[in-house]
């Protein structure tokens, strides 16, 4: 599997075949940030406050919308307004994992109305190829109003201790991503997946999957529930294009200062990589 991680975000944006990935790289280049903040708060007020305060320093805000105790249309409207104001994308970390017919209804419709506001979603391929096919099918339907403004990340690896997302599971993640590359924009993984040998050999010259790495924290190596952290520099050095930081930012004494620090360290690591110094 090829990697274009040595290229700048601007260069990747100029040739990227996926419209949403292209937009994401353009945002990163314009704002000089590769930070995704995981805003794991439990009220709409907290979520929108964080989005507004941290918006200038991030490329993406990641939500777990089902942990909000007061989710409503005001949540959706507020997020959309702030995404436009600060030029960031919204990633709903739903981790879809069910049969195709069910995930189609969970994504486009249902109580959370995810397709209406989340630019990016993710899924596990544990149920098999059908889950990726179903989500891609929904996004490409003629009556789906959001089209190229939506994209999927395949959950290829996890940072939790003892994760079973390894080996054949990760290989299947790459296979399905290649097969449905019009909707799959990349992976959530702990590294670039260049060494994974895919059975789908139809990789085009413009193949350029985006890598998001979770579990980035400057002040901790892990938690009591098995989470294992790495630094922005180590994540970028292993092939991450975008780093995902949660408690290290939103639970800091000064979340804005923390976001700025992650932005600085993430950007410096990226510049070192594209300049051949990583």
UniProtKB/Swiss-Prot annotation:
CDD domains per UniProt: OMP_decarboxylase_like
Catalyzed reactions: orotidine 5'-phosphate + H(+) = UMP + CO2
EC number: 4.1.1.23
GO biological process: 'de novo' pyrimidine nucleobase biosynthetic process; 'de novo' UMP biosynthetic process
GO molecular function terms noted in the UniProt entry: orotidine-5'-phosphate decarboxylase activity
Keyword Lyase: yes
GO cellular component terms, A-Z: cytosol
Record-stated family: Belongs to the OMP decarboxylase family.
UniProt-recorded name of the protein: Orotidine 5'-phosphate decarboxylase
């Amino acid at each position: 599997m090829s990697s274009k991680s040595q290229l700048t975000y601007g260069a990747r944006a100029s040739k990227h075949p996926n419209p949403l990935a292209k937009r994401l790289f353009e945002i990163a280049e314009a704002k000089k940030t590769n930070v995704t903040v995981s805003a794991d708060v439990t009220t709409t007020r907290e979520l929108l406050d964080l989005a507004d305060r941290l918006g200038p320093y991030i490329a993406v805000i990641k939500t777990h919308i089902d942990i909000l105790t007061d989710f409503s249309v005001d949540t959706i409207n507020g997020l959309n307004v702030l995404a436009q104001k600060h030029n960031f994308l919204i990633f709903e970390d739903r981790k879809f994992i069910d049969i195709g017919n069910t995930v189609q209804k969970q994504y486009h419709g249902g109580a959370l109305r995810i397709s209406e506001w989340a630019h990016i979603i993710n899924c596990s391929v544990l149920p098999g190829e059908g889950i990726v096919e179903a989500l891609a099918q929904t996004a490409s339907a003629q009556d789906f109003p959001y089209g190229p403004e939506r994209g999927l990340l395949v959950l290829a690896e996890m940072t939790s201790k003892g994760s079973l997302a390894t080996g054949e599971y990760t290989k299947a993640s790459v296979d399905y991503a290649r097969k449905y590359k019009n909707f799959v924009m990349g992976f959530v993984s702990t590294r670039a997946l260049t060494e994974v040998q895919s059975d789908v050999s139809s990789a085009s010259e413009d193949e350029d999957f985006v890598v998001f790495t979770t579990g980035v924290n400057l002040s901790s190596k892990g938690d009591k529930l098995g989470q294992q952290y790495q630094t922005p520099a180590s994540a970028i050095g292993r092939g991450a294009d975008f780093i995902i930081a949660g408690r290290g930012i939103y639970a800091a004494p000064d979340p804005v200062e923390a976001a700025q620090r992650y932005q600085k360290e993430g950007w410096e690591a990226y510049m070192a990589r594209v300049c051949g110094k990583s």
